[in-house]
Structure formats: structure tokens, C-alpha cells
Amino acid sequence: KLCKTYEEARDLCDEAQNDERIAIIGGGYIGVELAEGYNKSDHEVILFHKKETLLDRHIEPEIADKITNLLEDKGIQVKTGTIVKSFEDGANDTLIVKTADEAFEVDMAVICTGLLPQADLLQGKVDQLTNGAIVVNDYMETSNPDIFAAGDAASVKHNGLQTDVYMPLASQAVRQGALAGINVLDKRLRSIGTQSTTGMLIFGRTLACSGVTLAMALDAGINATKVAYKGSYRPDFMPNAHKVEIELVYDRNSRKVLGVQLWSKHDVSQAADTISALMHYHGTIDELSFVDMLFSPNFDQPFNYLNLVGQLAVKQENGYLRT
């Protein structure tokens, strides 16, 4: 079974009602969220991912390990660094999922290994990335000004990497579709690119991300490093002062913030949006460390957790936390 659309997800839920053991191939957002869903419906779940850590395009290994541990604590088998080689028919309408070293008998397998752009119609007619994604300018025009493209078929400018990338996200598709409609008759509004801001709620924990990981920054030739923060999101005398864990990636030369990932039982999703806006305007760790943010014991510490992770980055570079 494939899982790409809402309707396909509903069909998968309906068809799994009489199944017991389900394999999920692909440990991105869809795979992890499906693993949670099937676990909550009392299925035995095995999650396969070819990379060494889950959600490797979005988060640092340290946070990926926490997600893996959470899934395993819930009874989900997580097989990272594992490539599914083949599927074979098993006894009693079961399916055998084969890797290089093992075989797993399941009732159903769900494949959610990512998207490829469906752009064959324009192959050879417009500029495309190596994976086939249609290259568009800031107005959603292709190299043929009479043809516009948007969403999962189109590229997008990644502001952190300063290059066109393939980033099939619903939020990006909505923005590109709106821009294409606005600009189809006249160039009225430009795209301002993306920081690739994403998030999910998994077993009561919030994961929120924006920008690049350290590995992505280093691969792009940026002199980058990262800093980690862990602390209560609000004063400990308040009830449910949940811990917030943050990984912050920044450029050591320019001191610009390049990426952030947050993990908490508290809803920290809007913090990723805050950092996205900061990165869009080339904000630095110095600015982040003291940027004005509200304080109330109901909401945060006197220094917001985003201030505090910025201050840790400044300390890492300068040798002091704050003066």
C-alpha cells in the first residue's frame, strides 16, 4: 500500500482493522506518524528506515534518538540503518518483508519513502532539477514564461542553503499555488523562499524544526556548528513546567542562525516559526540571545528558552554567557 494522500491514509486505516502486524517502510514524518496511529489502534508495528536516524532530513541525531526511544517505549520496533530488499508472499495471506539479514512476517506493509516530482509531462521542455522537479523563479514561472509550476512538482529556493531544492511540504505547496495564481497575468508578488519549517505531535510530544541540520550546513560548505539547550519552559514553581530541548545550528563566521529543532511535552511549535522569521531576516545568535520577548510565569522564564539557547551559542563562541 502507498500512503501519499488523505484518502489513502483513510483506506489504510480501514484495511488494517483485521490485521495484527504492520510494517512501515520509511522513517520520515509520514512513517513516524503512521507508526503512532497503528500503535494506538493496538497493532504490532515495525518501522524500517534506511538511514541511521529517523527524520534525518529534519533533525539532529540527538533528537532522533529521543524519538526512537519514545517509539520503542510504546512497543514499536524501530529498524534504522535497514534497507528493505524485497517482499514475498507468506502463508495465510501474510507478507514477508526481507532485509539483508532478516525476514519479517506481517499482515500489511505501508510504503512511505518520500515523493518524486510528477513532472514527466514537461521533461525536456523546461529546466528541471536532477530529480525531475521543475525549476521556477520567484513568480512561479518555469524557464518557459507561459508555464507555471507549484507544489510537489516544483523546486523552491532554500534561504539557508541559497539554492533551489526539492521540498515537498504542504505549507510550501499552498504558498506556491497562491503565488502562481496571483502572478499568472502579471508579476505582482515574489516568493521569499523557505526555511523548511516543519513539525509534528507524536505521543504527546511536540517536534518543531526550521532551517538546516548541522550535516546539511557542513555539506553546503558552511563553517557551522551547533549548541544544545535543555531547561524548563517556565519557572519550576509553576505546574507542568515541562522541559524543552533545543538544538541550534549557526554559522561561526557570520554568526547567523541556520537551523533549530525543539522537542518537548509543551507545545513549542510556534517557537520554530519565530526562528524561521529570524533566519529569514539573517538574524544572529547575538540578536537571538537578547531579542525582546514577553515574560510571564504562565508562559516562559524571564529569559525565554530561545534567548537562552542563543546565549549558550554566544558563550560557545565568546567564552561568556551574558554580561
Each language-model region and where it sits:
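A conserved FAD-binding loop/helix module that cradles the flavin
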Residues: 136, 150-212, 300-320
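Conserved beta-strand-loop-beta-strand element in the redox core of flavoprotein oxidoreductases
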Residues: 88-103
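Conserved SAM/SAH-binding loop
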Residues: 6, 81-85, 100-101
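Flexible, glycine-rich terminal cap/loop adjacent to redox cofactors
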Residues: 113, 206-210, 220-323
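A short alpha-helix-loop-beta-strand transition element characteristic
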Residues: 128-131, 187-198, 223, 227
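FAD-site-proximal beta/loop scaffold in flavoenzymes
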Residues: 1-19, 103-179, 278
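General small-molecule cofactor/ligand-binding pocket signal
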Residues: 1, 77-79, 148, 225-227
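Rossmann-like dinucleotide-binding cores of NAD(P)H-dependent redox enzymes
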Residues: 23, 29-86, 169-172, 195-215
